[in-house]
């Protein structure tokens, strides 16, 4: 921009020297506001050049006056003009050099440095208010289903109820570090929020105090990652924008757990991920729909994922193999669980403001990977047989985002999940069988990092007995990201 302004000055000065009226002389170059000490130094040098321009203007005025009074010849006036033009050329060269030097200056670091380590603190403050109508029952106080969409907590078999709640529990904080070591970056990341901890009894009575809950914590070096992170079986970056904690939870893979993951770039936008992740088996008995946590797993879950990205799209396909295991009291069983997932994000339209996002997954014995355990991995009941009966699952969601303007946008989404229980053993009456939802929202970002949104969602839950429940929710959110 500085060079363009100076070229304009040069042209005007040369024209003025050859007889243009004084009214056409350009104004002094405006100084850009410095944003750093380096920019301040460059600005000072630019001001000195502007002073030289002012001297040149004075010389030109004297040349015109001399020509008008007959005290100098036309040759003298032309000589003065040439001298002024030469000065302008020299100034242009000097300013161009300054611009090049500024362009080559390193970008300001994101975060701050302590010793040889870069530190970054970030997150967001999110405030949510909602009005919910449950068509077939009511939730107990402190239930997470009051605060975000959790299909397994939609009541069934009761009278309709209405619930109003406001909170800031989805507020999130993280800090990360990066240290150069042997030509690679050694990184650490710790993240927590307040969303998934059970609300203390009486929390809303006065102070609304909530316990922080650990989300992610890992170290990475080069292509190796060790720690608690989103499962390799999904890509959380593909989830659609929503006022809700997740959005289409009923169709989502949703797991964070300990893992050892290795990423191998293959070129042309392809990456291969291989991971061994923390195992956990969730079961029901033939008479109770309460989830049983079994901690007798003997092998990690193994995941492989192939991911592709370019300027307008991101796609992945992943496979999961695991050992479903229950042992104790001299009894127990193992079974092979497996599944696959596909997902993606495709941007289109002016400035890529619109996008289509989707994910689908299916498998046997992988129920805990869907919707925070909407359905179990298996049914296990020692009173019937010392055997695991695996449950089949299919789930998916899709969304369409429309960017109406640079600051106004909407997302429309749908989610679905179905669990198929084995026929050879009884299924509890309240075991979750199916869930689906539809939602639409409108988001407005009046300034950078500040979002306001409103969303409507209709959802249905069905259980093995044939009972069903509905949920209708209008939710508003304000979010400041830092």
Predicted ranges, named:
Residues 2-29:
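Gram-negative bacterial Sec-dependent N-terminal signal peptides
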Residues 29-138:
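N-terminal periplasmic/intermembrane-space "pro-region" immediately following the signal or transit peptide
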Residues 104-107, 153-160, 242-246, 287-290, ...:
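Extracytoplasmic loops and strand-loop junctions of Gram-negative outer membrane beta-barrel proteins
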Residues 107-145, 151-282, 296-314, 345-351, ...:
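Outer membrane beta-barrel
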Residues 187-196, 278, 317-323, 413-418, ...:
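Transmembrane beta-strand segments that form the barrel wall of outer-membrane beta-barrel proteins
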Residues 310-432:
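Detector for outer-membrane/organellar transmembrane beta-barrel domains
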Residues 444, 470-482:
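Outer-membrane beta-barrel "beta-signal"
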């Amino acid at each position: 921009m500085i060079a363009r302004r100076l070229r304009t000055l040069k042209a005007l000065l040369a024209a003025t020297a050859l007889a243009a009226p004084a009214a056409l002389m350009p104004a002094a170059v405006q100084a850009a506001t410095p944003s750093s000490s380096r920019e301040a130094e460059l600005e000072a040098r630019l001001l000195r050049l502007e002073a030289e321009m002012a001297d040149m203007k004075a010389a030109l005025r004297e040349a015109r006056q001399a020509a008008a009074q007959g005290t100098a010849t036309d040759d003298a006036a032309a000589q003065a003009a040439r001298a002024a033009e030469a000065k302008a050329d020299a100034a242009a060269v000097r300013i161009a050099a300054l611009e090049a030097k500024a362009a080559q200056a390193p970008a300001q670091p994101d975060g701050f440095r302590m010793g040889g380590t870069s530190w970054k603190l970030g997150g967001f403050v999110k405030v949510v208010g909602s009005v919910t109508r449950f068509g077939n029952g009511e939730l107990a106080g402190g239930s997470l289903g009051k605060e975000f969409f959790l299909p397994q907590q939609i009541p069934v078999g009761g009278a309709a109820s209405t619930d109003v709640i406001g909170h800031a529990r989805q507020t999130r904080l993280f800090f990360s570090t990066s240290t150069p070591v042997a030509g690679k970056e050694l990184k650490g990341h710790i993240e927590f929020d307040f969303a998934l901890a059970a609300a203390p009894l009486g929390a809303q009575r006065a102070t609304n105090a909530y316990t922080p809950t650990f989300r992610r914590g890992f170290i990475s070096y080069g292509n190796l990652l060790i720690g608690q992170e989103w499962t390799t079986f999904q890509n959380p970056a593909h989830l659609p924008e929503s006022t809700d904690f997740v959005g289409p939870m009923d169709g989502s893979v949703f797991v964070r757990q300990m893992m050892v993951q290795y990423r191998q770039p293959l070129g042309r936008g392809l990456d291969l991920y291989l991971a061994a992740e923390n195992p956990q088996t969730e079961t029901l008995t033939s008479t109770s729909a309460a989830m049983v946590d079994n901690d007798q797993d003997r092998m990690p879950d193994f995941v492989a994922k192939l991911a592709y990205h370019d300027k307008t799209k991101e796609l992945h396909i992943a496979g999961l193999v695991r050992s479903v295991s229950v042992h104790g009291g001299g009894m127990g069983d193992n079974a092979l669980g497996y599944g696959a997932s596909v997902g993606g994000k495709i941007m289109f339209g002016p400035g890529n403001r619109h996008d289509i996002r989707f994910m689908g997954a299916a498998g046997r014995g992988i129920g805990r990977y869907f919707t925070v355990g909407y359905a179990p991995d298996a049914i296990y009941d020692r009173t019937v047989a010392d055997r695991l009966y695996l449950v089949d699952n299919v789930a998916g969601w899709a969304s369409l985002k429309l960017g109406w303007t640079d600051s106004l946008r909407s997302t429309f989404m749908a989610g679905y999940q179905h669990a198929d229980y084995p026929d050879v053993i009884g299924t509890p009456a309240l075991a979750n069988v199916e869930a689906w939802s539809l939602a639409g929202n409108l988001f407005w970002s009046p300034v950078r990092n500040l979002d306001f949104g409103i969303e409507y969602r209709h959802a249905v839950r069905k259980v093995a007995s044939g009972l069903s429940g509905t949920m209708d929710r209008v939710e508003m959110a304000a979010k400041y990201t830092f």
